[in-house]
């Protein structure tokens, strides 16, 4: 009883976390948003079940269906049944398909396993469920899952799938099996390749009217033998002998959630002959098949993989101005988890790119991780009924603006501070964007080097800067004075690579000011266009003023 209470509390806590993010909509807007998404999902259902085609990725469908259910619960609507069954399925299953309850995490699985024994883990193969009925050693009937009680007659189709044994013997001669028809793959690595819309592809093949050779691209994974041998080992052996070899290969005994987690992670990264979306843990001891009912299986649960891509709600659109003056667009998101990483922001790119994506707050976007774990947008999967886009800032900035602070220069000015403090420039450890904002807000810098004049007392009394950190910052600022001349020139934004600047052998500000365009053009990786940019940069009034100021501070290389 205590275990079930713990599971219930875990589920309620999880549901509470979902309900806590209910949209702040009026009743009228909630009705409109729910109705629009409900109609779209119904259309996808009709396409899937009636025509065997899918205009949406399986993962996107699943997540938008979950989002619809969340909205319905938020605003008191009746949640819809996910994945509506085919309307004309009329063949009774000899044994009902129960479905499988999903565990929210490893802790919930551990609680479920605690009072159970003789447990086994199998891959949750991603395809379409089927019943196989054998009578007198021959395949007598194949039935689609449907609503769990009735389904479509798939006998003709399944008889053309070479991976499905058409004759069996021994205990299987008169048996009912349940399993998954899947798309056969060679070396499928779930972590790298994702779901590839396998479920919809299988459904499409099974729904086609023609009996094409493409059915031989399908396989079957048997996951249940109702009223079969009591021992799992005996079941697996008999199935393998009959030709259902995958079941024996991919069924393992487990004692606890840690063992399940290890197998789950192994299959997530291994080459498999099918697409999976998690694992199923089942007890070898099952009730008699006459007691099986849809939604009432207490002897098995699923622990799904975190999707490679997540549907995330756009909460806000923000604009940032980089040190070179380019405006970039960032989408703030309702938090989602991707590969154990909490993602709350994703870079969209330029204003033009944002306009091409047509993204507004309230939209649902598909987000995944690119190289080095950087979030990226894969698609806009749903746009809200009411869409209001913010106005981007005027494109008045360039590589020669905002060395000096002003109200319109706030973002580019901060970007310049972040750049000069980075490791590759002045190497000011312990301060990032938030720290620079705090310093500038309190002390109102005149220009990008004004921080050199801050005293230990000023740093110590800066809101947002811990007192224990202020002494470290003052030390870092003093050390920066001893940085080489080329580092200071880089901090000033000279349009050259470090390699080109080092090759120039410039060691003083006066020497740099007198260098000609021809001199810069001969440096490695510096063409005529870049050389002209250097000339424009060094002749800029703000740059000259900064050079004079650094000279007054006796920074190496700037002295007269």
Curated annotation (Swiss-Prot):
Keyword Nucleus assigned: no
EC class of the enzyme, as a word: ligase
PROSITE patterns named in the record: DNA_LIGASE_N1, DNA_LIGASE_N2
Gene designation per UniProt: ligB
Keywords attached to this entry: DNA damage, DNA repair, DNA replication, Ligase, NAD
A biological-process GO annotation: DNA repair
Protein name per the record: DNA ligase B
Any matching Pfam family: DNA_ligase_OB
Active site: 124
Membership in a protein family: Belongs to the NAD-dependent DNA ligase family. LigB subfamily.
Enzyme Commission number(s) of this protein: 6.5.1.2
Catalytic reactions on record: NAD(+) + (deoxyribonucleotide)n-3'-hydroxyl + 5'-phospho-(deoxyribonucleotide)m = (deoxyribonucleotide)n+m + AMP + beta-nicotinamide D-nucleotide
A single MF term (Gene Ontology): DNA ligase (NAD+) activity
HAMAP family referenced in this protein's UniProt entry, alphabetically: DNA_ligase_B
InterPro entries named among the record's database cross-references: DNA_ligase_AS, DNA_ligase_B, DNA_ligase_CS, DNAligase_adenylation, DNAligase_N, NA-bd_OB-fold, NAD_dep_DNA_ligaseB, NAD_DNA_ligase_OB
Primary role: Catalyzes the formation of phosphodiester linkages between 5'-phosphoryl and 3'-hydroxyl groups in double-stranded DNA using NAD as a coenzyme and as the energy source for the reaction.
SUPFAM superfamilies in alphabetical order: DNA ligase/mRNA capping enzyme, catalytic domain, Nucleic acid-binding proteins, RuvA domain 2-like
